[in-house]
Regions:
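Short beta-strand/loop motif that positions the catalytic acidic residue
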Residues: 466, 472-474, 478
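Conserved hydrolase catalytic core segment
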Residues: 311-354
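Conserved alpha/beta-hydrolase
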Residues: 260-279
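A catalytic-pocket lid/entrance helix-loop region that shapes and gates access to the active site
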Residues: 337-385
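Conserved acidic catalytic loop of the alpha/beta-hydrolase fold
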Residues: 293-313
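The serine-hydrolase catalytic nucleophile loop
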Residues: 247-256
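Catalytic histidine-centered segment of alpha/beta-hydrolase-like enzymes
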Residues: 506-515
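Alpha/beta-hydrolase
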Residues: 366-461, 468
Length: 529
């Protein structure tokens, strides 16, 4: 929820109030007699709803028009409701102004003068992700629509009963429609409520620090960055996500909030993906990322963070593919780096080395247990015949049976859905990313040279010493980047200070399983570094 003037809310209120002011002198004959019979409970709901909806429409800037997205359709439907509402009034003012004229259906919509604005403001709440408006519209609807349904029945009388078979069919159809609406809007209300609660909590939690989203001009385009910390004087950690092309910045706060009391975390959607991708696409920048451009953009971002927070150096934290970017960067620019935290270090993806490594271990375990290895060998052969990201997925699924994680995820899908940072572009990119599993090659193409470069990466051939302290964190059940390979590499390198922390029972993303343990280990290492 973002406080600020809403011109959309003002327009909606004008469309609501103007015809009502005109109506005050053009009420249906005998209307006041019906008012005396209004249910006091429904009237109370109506007044409370009006009290909530009217100011809320004006003071939340989220209702204003953003860029064109899925949510724009929700705003459009809301506007259409208000337009039909105006047509309703025109029809009424041109009629004889009887109770029946006032309560005549429009386009099959019952009590349109009451239901249309309620639906419009409810949808405005969905569009703006604002639970205050949503609840206000629901309360208003209970009272306002309830009152006017009673008036309509008084004006028109009860409808004659339809035949039993017709009533049954219509009843079933209504039940199905109502159930669908409850499920769909129930989901949105749940997500928006959780999101709003988290937004308010974090506004208070970080009021003395920073909780900001922005686009930073980098060497090769704009980069989306989220800055989170409780004191802007704290050292800075730049987080490099995995992939390539797999940002999850909307969820990283769940993993790294434990660092924000001592560090400011900069979470970046790397060049060519996520919000950074959509921002540059909108500006006509269709440049595909390359290993060189990634490093240039990291350097630009590091310089921005150093300048903004008055720091000589920053900590680089990388996960999975981010450890490739981080290893390269700290080797090229040690003068700008305090330390390197590597989570799930990529040692060698050359010729998919880690996948072969994981397969051999799974095959050995399967044979030792006397399991049928036919399917395992089949998917491995398919992978070897055409090694790529798509054919890798069935292989990982088959080998995972023998590489079970014993530590559960610390977060649920509900936590992700209720993230205060989840945006439309995050959902768009995630769907685009997962379309790869269905054989869509567009995602791979969007990553330019990065995937090909990763497939030729072997850190043993590049870096045997570092000029900055380095810490390697791996899950003991990580077979995407096997911890034993990381340990062998760790033991072979030289650095001013080095440490390795194996998280027992965790997989490739230990920060999602034991975030508190991981953050404590990181803090301890950085203090000693």
């Amino acid at each position: 929820m973002k406080l600020g003037f809403s011109y959309i809310g003002l327009i909606w209120l004008i469309m609501l109030f103007v015809p009502n002011f005109i109506w005050m002198k053009n009420k249906p004959k005998g209307y006041e007699e019906h008012v005396k019979k209004e249910n006091k409970v429904l009237l109370a709901f109506e007044r409370v709803g009006q009290f909530i909806v009217t100011p809320a429409a004006l003071i939340f800037a989220n209702f204003n028009i953003h860029k064109i997205t899925f949510w724009s359709a929700v705003l459009l439907i809301s506007f259409i409701c208000m337009v039909i509402y105006e047509i309703f009034w025109i029809r009424y003012f041109r009629s004889e102004k009887t109770m029946k004229d006032f309560y005549r259906n429009m386009f099959g919509i019952a009590v349109p003068g009451a239901s249309l604005p309620v639906v419009a403001f409810f949808l405005l709440g969905i569009y703006g992700g604002n639970i205050i408006m949503i609840l206000g519209a629901i309360i208003l609807g209970i009272g306002h629509i309830g009152i006017h349904i009673a008036h309509r029945n008084e004006a028109w009388g009860k409808k004659p009963k339809k035949k039993l078979p017709v009533r049954i069919i219509l009843g079933i159809l209504k039940a199905v429609v109502i159930l669908l609406l409850v499920v769909v809007f129930g989901f949105f209300i749940y997500a928006i409520t959780g999101r709003n609660i988290n937004e308010v909590k974090r506004a208070f939690e970080f009021k003395e620090g920073i909780n900001e989203e922005l686009y930073v001009p980098l060497k090769n385009g704009d980069g989306f960055v989220r800055l989170i910390g409780k004191d802007q004087n704290n050292p800075v950690i730049l987080s490099l996500h995995g992939g390539p092309g797999e940002p999850a910045g909307y969820a990283e706060y769940l993993c790294f909030d434990g660092l924000t009391d001592e560090y400011t975390i900069a979470i970046w959607d790397e060049s060519g993906c996520g919000r950074s991708y959509y921002r540059n696409k909108e500006k006509g920048n269709t440049m595909l990322p390359t290993p060189q451009s990634q490093q240039e953009d990291i350097d630009s971002l590091v310089d921005y963070l150093r300048g903004r927070f008055n720091q000589d150096k920053v900590v680089i934290l990388g996960h999975s593919y981010g450890t490739v970017l981080g290893s390269i960067y700290i080797s090229a620019h040690p003068e700008k780096v305090t330390a390197f935290i590597s989570i799930g270090q990529v040692v060698s993806f050359k010729n998919f080395a880690s996948e072969h490594y994981a397969y051999e271990d799974a095959l050995a375990q399967a044979k030792a247990k006397g399991d049928d290895t036919t399917e395992l060998e089949k998917v491995y052969k398919a992978f070897c015949d055409d090694p790529n990201v798509v054919s890798m997925q069935p292989l990982r699924q088959a080998t995972s049976r023998y590489h079970q994680e014993t530590v559960p995820q610390a977060f649920t899908y509900a936590d992700l859905v209720c993230s205060p940072y989840l945006g439309v572009d995050d959902v768009r990119w995630t769907l685009f990313e997962y379309s790869m599993m269905l054989g869509n090659t567009a995602f791979e193409a969007s990553q330019g040279e990065l995937l090909a470069d990763l497939m030729g990466f072997d850190i043993n051939e590049r870096y045997k010493s570092y000029e900055v302290p380095v810490m390697y964190i791996s899950g003991s059940a990580d077979w995407t980047c096997p911890w034993t390979m990381v340990k062998e590499y760790y033991e072979s390198i030289e650095a001013p200070k080095k440490a390795m922390y194996v998280m027992e029972g965790c997989g490739h993303v230990p920060q999602n399983q034991l975030p508190d343990d991981l953050n404590s280990a990181v803090k301890q290492f950085l203090k000693s570094a």
